[in-house]
Amino acid sequence: MKQFIDFIPLLLFFIVYKTEPRAVDILGNTYMVGGIFSATAMLIISSVVVYGILYLKQRKLEKSQWLTLVACLVFGSLTLAFHSETFLKWKAPVVNWLFAVAFAGSHFIGDRPIIQRIMGHALTLPAAIWTRLNIAWIVFFLFCGAANLYVAFTYQEFWVDFKVFGSLGMTLIFLVGQGIYLSRHLHDTAPNTTKSED
């Protein structure tokens, strides 16, 4: 559910971007709808609304959501202020690389890798497995950042599609791979769990 909520602003961004550019009159003022800049405005507005509602309901936002929101506001505002999509193209790479830095830093700061802090309440795994899993996420974030950067500046006509659906596809593939990897190790901890319940 959380992943779907996080995807809403990006989906609205995509819909507006794909809309044929046209002038729309709102309260006597004329605005252009469609294209990268109106889509960027929609991304900013929808992100503020979505995460604002989440904050009011939960009284907090996760750190990853704060990072996503701040990055959206910063890079989106720069895109509109300078009328240059270059800033927006850097958003996904920077966010992914910041996640990679955070996951890498958790090996040296704190008592557990970040992935264990996120999933540890649901899974019992050896420390070595948690370390490998965390490293896998670091590599994944680095790869996603590099892929987004490459596509954004190499395939101008394709980068928005990749930003929305390519990143989602890579994430789903990675999660499936993670599930397969974890399934090979969960049975190692199952007997211990059963004994403790007895």
Curated annotation (Swiss-Prot):
The keyword Repeat does not apply. InterPro entries: YciB. One of its GO terms (cellular component) is plasma membrane. It is found in: Cell inner membrane. Pfam families: IspA. The chain crosses the membrane at residues 36-56, 67-87, 90-110, 133-153, 162-182. Keywords: Cell inner membrane, Cell membrane, Membrane, Transmembrane, Transmembrane helix. It is a multi-pass membrane protein. Its main location: membrane. Belongs to the YciB family. Plays a role in cell envelope biogenesis, maintenance of cell envelope integrity and membrane homeostasis. PANTHER family: INNER MEMBRANE-SPANNING PROTEIN YCIB (PTHR36917:SF1), INTRACELLULAR SEPTATION PROTEIN A-RELATED (PTHR36917). HAMAP family: YciB (MF_00189). This is Inner membrane-spanning protein YciB. It comes from Pseudomonas savastanoi pv. phaseolicola (strain 1448A / Race 6).
